[in-house]
Amino acid sequence: MKLLTLNVHAWLEDNQAEKIAIVAQTIVEKGYDVIALQEVNQLISAPTISQALKEDNYGVMLLRQVNQLVERKYSLFWSNSHIGYDKYDEGIAFLTHLPVYEVDPFYCSQHQQPDSILSRKILGLTLEYQGQLVDCYSCHINLPNAQGENQLDNIRTIVERSQSSNLKILMGDFNTDAITDPQSYQNIKALGLFDSYEMAVQKDTGITVEKAIDGWRNHSEEKRLDYIFLNQAKRVLSSQVIFNGKNKPVVSDHFGLEVELIL
Protein backbone atom coordinates (compact mmCIF):
# COMPACT_ATOMS: atom_id res chain seq x y z
CA MET A 1 0.00 0.00 0.00
CA LYS A 2 1.50 3.33 -1.08
CA LEU A 3 0.77 6.37 1.08
CA LEU A 4 1.61 10.07 0.86
CA THR A 5 0.98 12.84 3.37
CA LEU A 6 1.70 16.51 2.63
CA ASN A 7 0.84 19.80 4.28
CA VAL A 8 0.42 21.79 1.07
CA HIS A 9 0.35 25.37 2.50
CA ALA A 10 -2.16 26.11 -0.24
CA TRP A 11 -2.19 29.54 -1.92
CA LEU A 12 0.51 30.76 0.47
CA GLU A 13 3.31 29.62 -1.83
CA ASP A 14 5.07 31.48 -4.62
CA ASN A 15 4.58 29.87 -8.03
CA GLN A 16 1.58 27.94 -6.70
CA ALA A 17 0.35 26.70 -10.08
CA GLU A 18 3.76 25.26 -10.90
CA LYS A 19 3.90 23.53 -7.52
CA ILE A 20 0.44 21.99 -7.96
CA ALA A 21 1.65 20.60 -11.29
CA ILE A 22 4.70 19.05 -9.60
CA VAL A 23 2.52 17.33 -6.99
CA ALA A 24 0.09 16.13 -9.67
CA GLN A 25 2.87 14.71 -11.84
CA THR A 26 4.38 12.94 -8.84
CA ILE A 27 1.05 11.35 -7.92
CA VAL A 28 0.73 10.08 -11.48
CA GLU A 29 4.29 8.76 -11.45
CA LYS A 30 4.08 7.07 -8.05
CA GLY A 31 0.50 5.82 -8.17
CA TYR A 32 -0.20 6.35 -4.47
CA ASP A 33 -3.22 4.52 -3.11
CA VAL A 34 -4.05 7.13 -0.46
CA ILE A 35 -2.93 10.77 -0.29
CA ALA A 36 -3.62 12.82 2.84
CA LEU A 37 -3.37 16.61 2.51
CA GLN A 38 -3.49 19.41 5.07
CA GLU A 39 -3.92 23.20 4.76
CA VAL A 40 -6.00 22.57 1.65
CA ASN A 41 -7.27 26.12 1.24
CA GLN A 42 -9.92 27.90 -0.79
CA LEU A 43 -10.85 31.58 -0.74
CA ILE A 44 -14.00 32.20 1.29
CA SER A 45 -15.02 34.71 -1.40
CA ALA A 46 -14.49 32.36 -4.37
CA PRO A 47 -17.46 31.08 -6.43
CA THR A 48 -18.90 27.78 -5.26
CA ILE A 49 -18.95 24.58 -7.32
CA SER A 50 -20.70 22.42 -4.70
CA GLN A 51 -22.14 22.79 -1.22
CA ALA A 52 -18.67 22.83 0.35
CA LEU A 53 -16.16 23.39 -2.45
CA LYS A 54 -15.08 26.62 -4.14
CA GLU A 55 -13.65 26.71 -7.65
CA ASP A 56 -10.16 27.63 -6.41
CA ASN A 57 -9.97 24.77 -3.89
CA TYR A 58 -6.41 23.43 -4.02
CA GLY A 59 -7.67 19.85 -3.87
CA VAL A 60 -10.06 20.36 -6.77
CA MET A 61 -7.33 21.84 -8.95
CA LEU A 62 -4.92 19.04 -8.03
CA LEU A 63 -7.53 16.36 -8.69
CA ARG A 64 -8.33 17.72 -12.15
CA GLN A 65 -4.68 17.69 -13.16
CA VAL A 66 -4.11 14.18 -11.84
CA ASN A 67 -7.20 12.71 -13.47
CA GLN A 68 -6.23 14.12 -16.86
CA LEU A 69 -3.15 11.89 -16.73
CA VAL A 70 -4.28 8.59 -15.18
CA GLU A 71 -6.55 5.76 -16.26
CA ARG A 72 -7.52 4.79 -12.72
CA LYS A 73 -9.26 7.95 -11.54
CA TYR A 74 -8.87 9.48 -8.11
CA SER A 75 -11.64 10.94 -5.95
CA LEU A 76 -11.34 13.97 -3.68
CA PHE A 77 -12.72 14.21 -0.15
CA TRP A 78 -12.42 17.58 1.64
CA SER A 79 -13.72 19.13 4.85
CA ASN A 80 -13.31 22.65 6.23
CA SER A 81 -11.50 22.98 9.56
CA HIS A 82 -11.23 26.70 10.30
CA ILE A 83 -10.62 30.13 8.79
CA GLY A 84 -7.01 30.71 7.78
CA TYR A 85 -5.33 34.10 7.35
CA ASP A 86 -8.76 35.80 7.59
CA LYS A 87 -9.66 34.85 4.03
CA TYR A 88 -9.40 31.09 3.48
CA ASP A 89 -11.46 28.07 4.32
CA GLU A 90 -8.57 25.94 5.58
CA GLY A 91 -9.41 22.28 5.21
CA ILE A 92 -8.06 18.77 5.13
CA ALA A 93 -8.41 16.28 2.33
CA PHE A 94 -7.82 12.87 0.85
CA LEU A 95 -7.25 11.76 -2.71
CA THR A 96 -7.65 8.04 -3.34
CA HIS A 97 -8.34 5.64 -6.16
CA LEU A 98 -9.52 2.93 -3.75
CA PRO A 99 -13.18 2.07 -3.03
CA VAL A 100 -14.53 4.24 -0.19
CA TYR A 101 -17.12 2.79 2.19
CA GLU A 102 -17.49 5.64 4.68
CA VAL A 103 -16.54 9.31 4.96
CA ASP A 104 -16.27 10.65 8.50
CA PRO A 105 -15.33 14.31 9.10
CA PHE A 106 -15.20 15.29 12.79
CA TYR A 107 -13.52 17.68 15.18
CA CYS A 108 -10.91 16.12 17.45
CA SER A 109 -10.53 19.39 19.38
CA GLN A 110 -12.61 21.05 22.10
CA HIS A 111 -12.73 24.17 19.92
CA GLN A 112 -15.13 23.55 17.05
CA GLN A 113 -15.87 26.99 15.63
CA PRO A 114 -14.37 28.00 12.27
CA ASP A 115 -13.10 31.32 13.68
CA SER A 116 -10.63 29.58 16.01
CA ILE A 117 -7.30 28.22 14.75
CA LEU A 118 -7.52 25.69 17.60
CA SER A 119 -10.52 24.06 15.88
CA ARG A 120 -9.08 20.94 14.27
CA LYS A 121 -11.20 18.93 11.87
CA ILE A 122 -10.12 15.39 11.04
CA LEU A 123 -11.21 13.59 7.88
CA GLY A 124 -11.71 9.86 8.18
CA LEU A 125 -12.19 7.42 5.30
CA THR A 126 -12.93 3.72 5.46
CA LEU A 127 -11.30 2.22 2.36
CA GLU A 128 -10.93 -1.21 0.85
CA TYR A 129 -7.45 -2.41 -0.04
CA GLN A 130 -6.86 -5.96 -1.28
CA GLY A 131 -10.08 -7.14 0.33
CA GLN A 132 -9.37 -5.50 3.70
CA LEU A 133 -11.11 -2.47 5.20
CA VAL A 134 -8.76 0.22 6.48
CA ASP A 135 -9.62 3.38 8.44
CA CYS A 136 -7.48 6.34 7.31
CA TYR A 137 -7.40 9.77 8.94
CA SER A 138 -5.99 13.02 7.52
CA CYS A 139 -4.78 15.00 10.54
CA HIS A 140 -3.55 18.50 11.30
CA ILE A 141 -3.00 18.49 15.05
CA ASN A 142 -2.62 21.30 17.59
CA LEU A 143 0.78 21.94 19.17
CA PRO A 144 1.63 20.03 22.38
CA ASN A 145 1.50 23.31 24.34
CA ALA A 146 -1.62 24.74 22.67
CA GLN A 147 -3.49 26.93 25.17
CA GLY A 148 -7.03 25.66 25.68
CA GLU A 149 -6.45 22.28 24.04
CA ASN A 150 -4.92 19.00 25.17
CA GLN A 151 -3.03 17.55 22.23
CA LEU A 152 -3.12 13.99 23.55
CA ASP A 153 -6.87 14.15 24.16
CA ASN A 154 -7.25 15.40 20.57
CA ILE A 155 -5.27 12.45 19.19
CA ARG A 156 -6.99 9.99 21.53
CA THR A 157 -10.31 11.11 20.05
CA ILE A 158 -9.05 10.00 16.63
CA VAL A 159 -7.65 6.68 17.86
CA GLU A 160 -10.94 5.87 19.61
CA ARG A 161 -13.23 7.21 16.88
CA SER A 162 -14.01 3.77 15.48
CA GLN A 163 -14.48 0.62 17.53
CA SER A 164 -13.83 -1.59 14.51
CA SER A 165 -10.88 -3.97 14.32
CA ASN A 166 -9.74 -2.32 11.08
CA LEU A 167 -6.18 -1.11 10.74
CA LYS A 168 -6.14 2.60 11.53
CA ILE A 169 -3.69 4.89 9.73
CA LEU A 170 -3.23 8.44 11.04
CA MET A 171 -1.49 10.61 8.44
CA GLY A 172 -0.48 14.22 8.59
CA ASP A 173 1.05 17.19 10.36
CA PHE A 174 1.19 16.43 14.09
CA ASN A 175 3.03 19.66 15.04
CA THR A 176 5.31 17.60 17.29
CA ASP A 177 9.04 17.35 16.70
CA ALA A 178 10.41 13.91 17.54
CA ILE A 179 13.94 15.35 17.54
CA THR A 180 13.73 18.32 19.94
CA ASP A 181 10.65 17.20 21.91
CA PRO A 182 11.01 13.43 22.25
CA GLN A 183 8.71 13.27 25.29
CA SER A 184 5.69 14.67 23.39
CA TYR A 185 6.48 12.26 20.56
CA GLN A 186 6.64 9.31 22.96
CA ASN A 187 3.36 10.44 24.54
CA ILE A 188 1.66 10.17 21.14
CA LYS A 189 2.99 6.66 20.57
CA ALA A 190 1.85 5.69 24.08
CA LEU A 191 -1.74 6.07 22.84
CA GLY A 192 -1.19 2.77 21.02
CA LEU A 193 0.38 4.06 17.82
CA PHE A 194 3.36 2.78 15.83
CA ASP A 195 5.47 5.23 13.82
CA SER A 196 5.88 3.86 10.30
CA TYR A 197 9.24 5.68 10.10
CA GLU A 198 10.63 3.63 12.97
CA MET A 199 9.37 0.36 11.45
CA ALA A 200 10.62 1.07 7.92
CA VAL A 201 13.24 -1.20 6.38
CA GLN A 202 14.46 1.67 4.19
CA LYS A 203 14.34 5.24 5.48
CA ASP A 204 16.07 8.60 5.33
CA THR A 205 16.36 11.34 7.97
CA GLY A 206 12.60 11.84 8.24
CA ILE A 207 13.07 15.64 8.31
CA THR A 208 9.90 17.32 6.96
CA VAL A 209 10.55 20.95 7.97
CA GLU A 210 13.98 22.57 7.86
CA LYS A 211 13.25 26.22 8.71
CA ALA A 212 11.11 28.41 10.95
CA ILE A 213 7.46 28.32 9.82
CA ASP A 214 4.09 29.47 11.23
CA GLY A 215 3.68 27.92 14.67
CA TRP A 216 7.43 27.32 14.83
CA ARG A 217 8.72 30.88 14.43
CA ASN A 218 11.55 30.51 16.95
CA HIS A 219 12.62 27.09 15.74
CA SER A 220 14.84 27.28 12.66
CA GLU A 221 16.39 23.84 13.15
CA GLU A 222 15.42 20.71 11.20
CA LYS A 223 12.22 19.10 12.45
CA ARG A 224 10.25 15.90 12.03
CA LEU A 225 6.64 17.12 12.24
CA ASP A 226 4.83 14.92 9.71
CA TYR A 227 4.04 11.28 10.38
CA ILE A 228 2.15 8.21 9.29
CA PHE A 229 1.12 6.34 12.43
CA LEU A 230 -0.48 2.87 12.53
CA ASN A 231 -2.42 1.27 15.37
CA GLN A 232 -1.04 -2.14 14.43
CA ALA A 233 2.53 -3.21 13.72
CA LYS A 234 2.93 -3.90 10.01
CA ARG A 235 5.81 -4.55 7.64
CA VAL A 236 6.88 -1.14 6.38
CA LEU A 237 9.07 -1.38 3.29
CA SER A 238 10.10 2.26 3.10
CA SER A 239 9.62 5.73 4.56
CA GLN A 240 10.97 8.56 2.42
CA VAL A 241 10.73 12.33 2.59
CA ILE A 242 9.64 13.84 -0.73
CA PHE A 243 9.30 17.38 -2.14
CA ASN A 244 12.42 18.39 -0.19
CA GLY A 245 14.59 19.60 -3.08
CA LYS A 246 16.48 16.31 -3.22
CA ASN A 247 13.60 13.92 -3.86
CA LYS A 248 11.42 16.17 -6.09
CA PRO A 249 11.30 19.98 -5.89
CA VAL A 250 10.03 21.81 -2.80
CA VAL A 251 6.30 22.59 -3.09
CA SER A 252 5.37 23.79 0.43
CA ASP A 253 6.82 24.93 3.76
CA HIS A 254 6.55 21.25 4.75
CA PHE A 255 8.09 18.37 2.86
CA GLY A 256 5.95 15.33 2.08
CA LEU A 257 6.25 11.85 3.54
CA GLU A 258 5.73 8.73 1.43
CA VAL A 259 5.42 5.28 2.99
CA GLU A 260 5.00 1.85 1.45
CA LEU A 261 3.74 -0.96 3.65
CA ILE A 262 2.43 -4.51 3.46
CA LEU A 263 -0.96 -5.17 5.02
Each predicted region: which residue ranges?
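Metal-dependent catalytic neighborhoods of phosphoester/phosphodiester hydrolases
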Residues: 16, 40-67, 84-89, 179-188
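Short loop/turn segments at strand-loop or loop-helix junctions that form parts
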Residues: 6, 38-41
